[in-house]
Amino acid sequence: QIVLKVVKDINKQYSIHDFRIVTGPTHTNLIFDVLIPSNDQIKHDLLKEQINEKLQNINPNYQTVMQIEHSFV
């Protein structure tokens, strides 16, 4: 829920899928794919940075492993 809210706060048209959590002794990996509209021109590195920063503000132990995908619809 937290990751989806962060992504939707950036752009309501974005969504996530294939979400997994892997908890370790020093941090928690949040692994997921972000689906963005096919015509969206945001730079993937910038989007990853924005999402990561917002999640680390919520919990500094969160580490993100994400892929950005463009929808085909």
Model-predicted segments: where are they?
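Peripheral (non-transmembrane) domains and long loops of multi-pass membrane proteins
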Residues: 1-73
